[in-house]
């Protein structure tokens, strides 16, 4: 009962002195206005930039600047790093190519092979993966030139000069999917690492028994000149870059762009909270002083309640 009476008296007093009440509302709006503008800037513009950085896997890619010699033991150790989301070896660029042709097209498409596997950030998470030596995922450009789609079988071939004569080896490849244009804009094919290794071995004159390609037997330990590496998040790129630098591996990343956006986010957050705290304190002091003055002015009226 007392609460209802208090609310009734407060509402009547509020409407009776509507000019003073309107001033309180305007004061609150003056405090909230800049905060809302900064809130929109922080979570709109900067938030959109952060989301773009997070969603684009290219921003998480770490590329070696020059060729090196990386063995399987090195790859096994690097995969244990907390910041590594995806890591596969790369062969020499000149060896990672294959000529593709299909029955639906008269064109022979020279295609770059991209070593891939489970968790490849450039391929859709729910899409097909090249999980076999004869399975590939074509880029949109290559699929259009070959006029093929998922489920089709195409011919792949590679040439070499061996024993003083030119040879060409063929392999039937099954297209298990077509990658989006954003994944790879050129003529390319995502393939199992074993296929990329087999083509390098064939061109170097080594035998590939799994595919029936003859050559010199070589059972020595393999080393790779490069790798495909993606960090688990944009926040892990800088740490991975530093870690690789400690190992003497010079890499190229987009850490500078990531740091710029993150620094903008931190600065706007600091400004936002500083204005919020100062505005809240100022509004509280102003409101308190106004209420104190009103109570003092209405002391006689309040004393008879």
Predicted regions located by residue number:
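Membrane-proximal extracellular/periplasmic loop immediately following the first transmembrane helix
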Residues: 50-101, 107-110, 243
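Basic-flanked hydrophobic alpha-helices used for secretion and membrane insertion
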Residues: 121-124, 137, 148-252
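Alpha-helical transmembrane segments of integral membrane proteins
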Residues: 23-34, 269-289
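Membrane-embedded alpha-helices of multi-pass transport/permease systems
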Residues: 22, 42, 281-302
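The feature marks short, hydrophobic/small-residue-biased sequence motifs that occur predominantly
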Residues: 89-132, 190-198
């Amino acid at each position: 009962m007392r609460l209802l009476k208090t609310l009734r008296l407060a509402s009547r007093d509020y409407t009776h002195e509507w000019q003073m009440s309107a001033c309180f509302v305007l004061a609150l709006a003056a405090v909230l206005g800049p905060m809302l503008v900064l809130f929109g800037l922080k979570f709109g513009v900067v938030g959109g930039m952060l989301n773009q950085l997070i969603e684009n896997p290219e921003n998480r890619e770490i590329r070696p600047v020059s060729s090196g010699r990386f063995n399987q033991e090195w790859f096994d150790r690097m995969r244990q790093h907390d910041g590594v989301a995806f890591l596969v070896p790369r062969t020499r660029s000149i060896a990672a190519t294959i000529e593709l042709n299909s029955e639906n097209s008269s064109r022979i498409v020279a295609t770059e092979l991209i070593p891939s596997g489970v968790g490849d950030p450039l391929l859709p998470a729910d899409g097909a993966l090249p999980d076999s030596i004869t399975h590939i995922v074509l880029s949109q450009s290559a699929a259009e030139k070959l006029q093929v789609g998922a489920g089709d079988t195409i011919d792949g071939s590679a040439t070499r000069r061996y024993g003083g004569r030119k040879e060409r080896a063929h392999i039937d490849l099954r297209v298990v999917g077509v990658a989006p244009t954003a994944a790879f804009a050129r003529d390319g094919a995502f393939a199992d690492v074993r296929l990329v290794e087999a083509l390098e071995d064939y061109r170097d004159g080594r035998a590939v028994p799994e595919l029936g390609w003859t050559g010199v037997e070589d059972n020595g330990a393999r080393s790779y000149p490069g790798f495909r590496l993606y960090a688990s998040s944009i926040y892990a790129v800088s740490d991975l870059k530093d870690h690789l630098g400690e190992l003497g591996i010079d890499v190229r990343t987009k850490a500078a762009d990531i740091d710029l956006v993150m620094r903008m986010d931190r600065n706007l957050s600091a400004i936002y909270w500083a204005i919020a705290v100062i505005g809240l304190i100022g509004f509280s002091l102003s409101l308190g002083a106004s209420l104190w003055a009103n109570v003092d002015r209405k002391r006689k009226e309040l004393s008879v309640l």
